[in-house]
Amino acid sequence: MGRFIFLSSGLLVVFLSLSGTGADFQCPSEWSAYGQHCYRAFKYEKSWAEAEKFCMEQANDGHLVSIQSIKEANFVAKLVSGIIAYIWIGLRDRRKEQQCTSEWNDGSKVTYVNWREGESQMCQVLAIWSGFKNWVNTDCASHNPFVCKSPA
């Protein structure tokens, strides 16, 4: 009887420690969880605008992936490691009057950047030769695979 109570108490501690860590939600089939978001890599090749529209149709509040930290960048790099191409992310140039600023398409602030040295900002892709960690600009009309991200 004492072992049963000890085992039950242990399971309760494990359950309580997992709640609130992201383990209390489930992403749709074929999507992967990281933090409080769900991610999915798509091998279809689309323009940046087509990929963004596709992501918005796939998930509630979905967008091309925004990358907020080196840890998230590493997660996304692993997610797309089997794809042999540039990968669209949700960062692009926005011109406001004479100013040029880069913004994530989901409205989040750009707090982490990893542009390849010397690159100007247009639409951004993850570069395969960098293990999908460096960002390179490319024409927004070119067709590439992409990663969608949505809140869990």
Curated annotation (Swiss-Prot):
GO cellular component: extracellular region
Main subcellular location of this protein, as a coarse class: secreted
PROSITE patterns: C_TYPE_LECTIN_2
Entry keyword Nucleotide-binding: no
Domain C-type lectin: 34-149
Bridged cysteine pairs (disulfide): 27-38, 55-148, 123-140
Family annotation (InterPro entries): C-type_lectin-like (IPR001304), C-type_lectin-like/link_sf (IPR016186), C-type_lectin/snaclec_domain (IPR050111), CTDL_fold (IPR016187)
Annotated signal sequence range: 1-23
Keywords of the record: Disulfide bond, Hemostasis impairing toxin, Secreted, Signal, Toxin
Superkingdom field: Eukaryota
One Pfam short name: Lectin_C
ATP-binding recorded as keyword: no
Subcellular location: Secreted
One GO MF term attached to the UniProt entry: toxin activity
Tissues of expression: Expressed by the venom gland.
Family: Belongs to the snaclec family.
Subunit structure: Heterodimer; disulfide-linked.
Protein task: Interferes with one step of hemostasis (modulation of platelet aggregation, or coagulation cascade, for example).
Other remarks on this protein: Shows greater sequence similarity to the alpha than beta subunits compared to other heterodimer snaclecs.
Protein name per its UniProtKB record: Snaclec 5
Organism ancestry: Eukaryota, Metazoa, Chordata, Craniata, Vertebrata
